[in-house]
Amino acid sequence: MPQQIELRNIALQAAQPLVHGVSLTLQRGRVLALVGGSGSGKSLTCAATLGILPAGVRQTAGEILADGKPVSPCALRGIKIATIMQNPRSAFNPLHTMHTHARETCLALGKPADDATLTAAIEAVGLENAARVLKLYPFEMSGGMLQRMMIAMAVLCESPFIIADEPTTDLDVVAQARILDLLESIMQKQAPGMLLVTHDMGVVARLADDVAVMSDGKIVEQGDVETLFNAPKHTVTRSLVSAHLALYGMELAS
């Protein structure tokens, strides 16, 4: 399995250019946070990595490398990169139980799909009464439960990399904290490389090792998390950090 995945000069276009020359490097055991405002190109960059671009959007330049060798996004999805989506409800077939979803995911990737394995993954993400959860349909579960189930599926994939696209969006504060605890636990126990897409600098401060800031489809600043919080250079980065510090009655040093 690869130790590093690199996005090199990715460009995306629809009727007009959307993403311009984006380069990112994911490394095993490190969390790279991709931050920026809505419409900055974060989710499109993830979609390009996984080969799931929306209709009408095409990649016009760039390549993806695994340990320095060119690779197709389709060869990465699921096997080498597990995904935790922004809206978990849209990721599940409403006609299938959690057991069916989990089992089919495992079988598609050639992983063990016995009930003991599925139960262990569900228990690992803190969902109580795994036998009952496996019988549930998506509409019978809260957003927080579905997000935990997505994380359980990522655990079942045993992929060396994870893309987590706004994993705490639309969750209450308690559910957000639990999801962050789970992601932190996965990093400690399995040490995958993680691309964490978020607009929440509090999430960045807690989980990230490195940060890339996007604005208008471009990476405008990139570096380790401590440097970006203490000495942000670009105006977009300064605005993000200042807004985060203001929540705690603090100001960014001039």
From Swiss-Prot:
Pfam families: ABC_tran. InterPro entries: AAA+_ATPase (IPR003593), ABC_Ni/Peptide_Import (IPR050388), ABC_transporter-like_ATP-bd (IPR003439), ABC_transporter-like_CS (IPR017871), Nickel_NikD (IPR014138), P-loop_NTPase (IPR027417). GO terms for cellular component: ATP-binding cassette (ABC) transporter complex, substrate-binding subunit-containing; membrane; plasma membrane. One of its GO terms (molecular function) is transmembrane transporter activity. The keyword ATP-binding applies. It catalyses: Ni(2+)(out) + ATP + H2O = Ni(2+)(in) + ADP + phosphate + H(+). Residues 2-241 form the ABC transporter domain. ATP binds at residues 36-43. It is found in: Cell inner membrane. The complex is composed of two ATP-binding proteins (NikD and NikE), two transmembrane proteins (NikB and NikC) and a solute-binding protein (NikA). PANTHER family: DIPEPTIDE TRANSPORT ATP-BINDING PROTEIN DPPD, OLIGOPEPTIDE TRANSPORT ATP-BINDING PROTEIN APPD. Part of the ABC transporter complex NikABCDE involved in nickel import. Responsible for energy coupling to the transport system. Belongs to the ABC transporter superfamily. Nickel importer (TC 3.A.1.5.3) family. This is Nickel import ATP-binding protein NikD. It comes from Escherichia coli (strain K12).
